[in-house]
Amino acid sequence: MRPDHMNFCCLCAAILSSTAVLFGQDPLGETALLTKNPNHVVCTFFEDCTMESLFPALCAHASQDDPLYVLGNSYCWFVSKLHITDPKEALFKEKGDLSIQNFRFLSFTDCSSKESSPSIIHQKNGQLSLRNNGSMSFCRNHAEGSGGAISADAFSLQHNYLFTAFEENSSKGNGGAIQAQTFSLSRNVSPISFARNRADLNGGAICCSNLICSGNVNPLFFTGNSATNGGAICCISDLNTSEKGSLSLACNQETLFASNSAKEKGGAIYAKHMVLRYNGPVSFINNSAKIGGAIAIQSGGSLSILAGEGSVLFQNNSQRTSDQGLVRNAIYLEKDAILSSLEARNGDILFFDPIVQESSSKESPLPSSLQASVTSPTPATASPLVIQTSANRSVIFSSERLSEEEKTPDNLTSQLQQPIELKSGRLVLKDRAVLSAPSLSQDPQALLIMEAGTSLKTSSDLKLATLSIPLHSLDTEKSVTIHAPNLSIQKIFLSNSGDENFYENVELLSKEQNNIPLLTLSKEQSHLHLPDGNLSSHFGYQGDWTFSWKDSDEGHSLIANWTPKNYVPHPERQSTLVANTLWNTYSDMQAVQSMINTIAHGGAYLFGTWGSAVSNLFYAHDSSGKPIDNWHHRSLGYLFGISTHSLDDHSFCLAAGQLLGKSSDSFITSTETTSYIATVQAQLATPLMKISAQACYNESIHELKTKYRSFSKEGFGSWHSVAVSGEVCASIPIVSNGSGLFSSFSIFSKLQGFSGTQDGFEESSGEIRSFSASSFRNISLPMGITFEKKSQKTRNYYYFLGAYIQDLKRDVESGPVVLLKNAVSWDAPMANLDSRAYMFRLTNQRALHRLQTLLNVSYVLRGQSHSYSLDLGTTYRF
């Protein structure tokens, strides 16, 4: 053995020892060192190790009473194909603590033990801990007794940081992977997976009397485990004592129980006392058992659920019955077991599978006859189920994840044998769900929401403070049904949340509707107060609701009648961006004209070819102040052309180019534009005046995309537009002595004109709308001053322009927008931006022999809008 290894191991042993007195050391080959101290034994690894049998000396020390610490020092320990026939061949700790820690990778794979032997790792009368390890893998291990991989009186799995997996372990007894009296699965950084473990008796993955699973900051997965009771976890007690059989899942990041199964009770979990609180999302999906599809609570036990940092979901869990086959079930409460509370704070509690509570008067559970116990007697002293939620959270019972064939009474009915107290927040029944309980009380600040088609049944008198019926659930056949000996409801109202589109229902609301059923009562009950017909403001169809009672031999029905008036389009439909596209074209053509005017200035040359990058940013907001009327436009492209500039300041320019643009409003609509541009410019100069003229032609193809938030489909459409613009300019140059900041300045005035039209079109997908053709014409009068500076020494040319622009005449024509599915139309006019504007432009040109570079920056400020343009170009002069 290397001396430095020996010294390091001695140091570790000294640190761990309170007395630092060494009784002896036992090398384990070249891999590890056993150090005997007065109070404990330390096994220290100093290299990676792979083995098919454990160190005999390590197993011998494990059988002694002193605590044993196995330290990995960030090395790997791989144990595989270990077949134990004698406890002396395993980590068998009858007394004292056993700790395995600080391994980079710890693996026990394909190991097995006979019935007379314990698990691969076994501890009794002490504490077993696996902590501070990187990755851990316990796979395909088997025990003829209990605990396929690990068995212990007290076991803690803590502070592990990479990945932990217990997969495909099995046992003939309890705990396919782990069997313990108490188990702490806490404060791990690593994701933890229990997958495809199997136990012949209880707890496919874990079987223990008390389990605390808390503070794990990465997901926990329990998938594909199986057992007789508790497909994934079993925490029950043979003795009827409250301190036994408890399971606590608290403050974990995310937890998934999926595809676990039990032959008898608890597809995912079978426990006596269970608390689920302050976790991230917790999901129970596709679990199955004979009793308790996801969770079964032992007789005399309790269950409490608090959705703290994420929702709790029960979906597609089922229990097997002899006469009904598979029946959906989330939770089964055995005789005298209670569901103490459902509390939704920062997440919802969603039951897409029903709850069943066994009647105290029954001798054994009969899950195939759920309806027979609807009105079974309940002692007056039964503990109530307390339901509380925050303002925007709900406890939801729903069958919306069921197919029509699966919507049978057993799959729809949640049967409770204890009173319900709705203290605060929202209790929601959706999509034909049925809730049955001995009684239900509702505090004034709480809200009961029942969709049409759902039912509430109580065996005692029912007094409700507020009942809300969601508008989106209404149709001409289904209604809310309430069964109670006597019923009183202080307030009934129709609700429509902001993200629902009930008033967009063309089939139901575009015409007058009579006899829409809202609420059905038994004939023994009396009429209730009619709902309030006054509606809050909304988009879509506008109209009036009226209500009345209709009596029949079957009972009383509350009937709603609808009288339509008009239609107010949803803001997501009201896009003005299409009409305002002509403003974008106008701004782009101004940027092109600015670039062409720049080419007309500068040094003289006989003939030149040039090219330039052109960019334009245009921001606008209408005076309405609505986000839908605010938009911005960006374009980038190029121009290339030929030009000449004489010594007498005569000039001529011919150019063509392309711009690619994208526009979007402050809402959900965007357009992409491809523009093709051609322009010509000429200037004549005299000693007293310069006269120039310019004409520009633009043809564009536009594509509209609408990413609806309130409607399901994305809208798409395309259209074509054509625009022409021109200007005539007269300027009077004044030459200074050339010694100042500028060598000359000019006073100028222009007459500018713009005319643009765009075709009407229909969208090809989404909420299909038809947009009318529109046009925009504008005549303006810019006036201002320019300053020039030519430097012969540096061959630089500077040019500054400042102008005031007054629009003389503006003419806008635009038609309505039509929603084709109901032929409703509305106006989406073009924005009326200010008729006054200010323009500033700064240009620099520099001659480099035959090349001439160009930089042009301009800014236009107008009431409710402003734009920037930047051009970079070069000219080759012949």
From Swiss-Prot:
Biased composition (Polar residues): 372-381
The keyword Secreted is annotated on this UniProt entry: yes
Stored SUPFAM superfamilies: Autotransporter
Name of the protein in question: Probable outer membrane protein PmpI
Residues covered by region (Disordered): 360-381
Family stated for the protein in its record: Belongs to the PMP outer membrane protein family.
Protein species of origin: Chlamydia trachomatis serovar D (strain ATCC VR-885 / DSM 19411 / UW-3/Cx)
Membrane topology: Peripheral membrane protein
Location in or out of the cell: Secreted, Cell wall; Cell outer membrane
One Pfam family linked to the record: Chlam_PMP
Biased composition (Low complexity): 360-371
Keyword entries, A-Z: Cell outer membrane, Cell wall, Membrane, Secreted, Signal, Transmembrane, Transmembrane beta strand
InterPro entries, A to Z: Autotransporte_beta, Autotransporte_beta_dom_sf, Polymorphic_membr_middle, POMP_repeat
Coiled coil region boundaries: none
Entry keyword annotation includes Signal: yes
Gene label: pmpI
Annotated signal peptide: 1-24
GO CC annotation terms, alphabetical: cell outer membrane; extracellular region
Domain Autotransporter: 602-878
